[in-house]
Amino acid sequence: MWQDVVDLKDFYDREIGRTARHLLRARIRALWPDLTGQRLLGLGYATPYLRQFLGEAERVAAVMPAAQGVMPWPREGLGMTTLADETELPFPDNSIDRVLLVHALESSEHPSDMLGEVWRVLGGGGRLMLVVPNRRSLWSHLERTPFGHGQPFTQGQVTRLLRSRGFTPLNTDRALLFWPFSWRTWLRAAPGWERIGRRWFTPFAGVIVIEAMKQLYGAQPAKPVKRRRA
């Protein structure tokens, strides 16, 4: 079930959300250090992680699923968000270079179809980055944050799902190794706990970050089934 966009925004407006965004942005940037000239699409509630690419990527757009709702973004300039069904993206085939999924895979009732649609809009060799709640983490079991909603995953589950829809996993990282508590002193120490956790406790990180590439050859993913709208 998709979370309400207002609840997602409220989380990222709080100190714990700002801390999570700062730490997770760093892992995303480490995997995608330069998107100059790339066409970037965020799907789900990815806008907290897209701003760092404004002015660098050739084009940035954000799709928020209809069941979630939409928020205008960015605050300044022309709006870059649109509302759409996650299995019927409003983009031509092979028109996107990079896709970032955040608060998406775990919420969709049709995750395989959604990945099939991402495969369709990505160009040859295009890259997909997934941020999903880690089933083994405390974050995935506490509903006080968005990462505690929906279906959490293991790395193996995500890898198999990606391969079944025509993607080759390339890189894996972890983030959010501090516990999801809102105590101010705890959050101030979060960067330090993140460094310690990355050394010793990565299996229990809050989220799994996986980069994958669109595979052009071999088995092609089935076309998503179009469902009649009510």
Residue ranges and their predicted role:
Residues 1-34:
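Class I SAM-dependent methyltransferase Rossmann-like catalytic core
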Residues 34-89:
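Class I SAM-dependent methyltransferase SAM/SAH-binding core
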Residues 99-100:
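Hydrophobic beta-strand segment of the Class I
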Residues 112-127:
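A short glycine-rich, Lys/Arg-flanked "PGG" loop and its adjoining helix->strand segment in the class I
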Residues 127-152:
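Conserved class I S-adenosyl-L-methionine
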Residues 149-172, 176, 208:
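Short alpha-helix
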Residues 194-230:
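C-terminal lobe and adjacent flexible extensions of AdoMet/dcAdoMet transferase-like proteins
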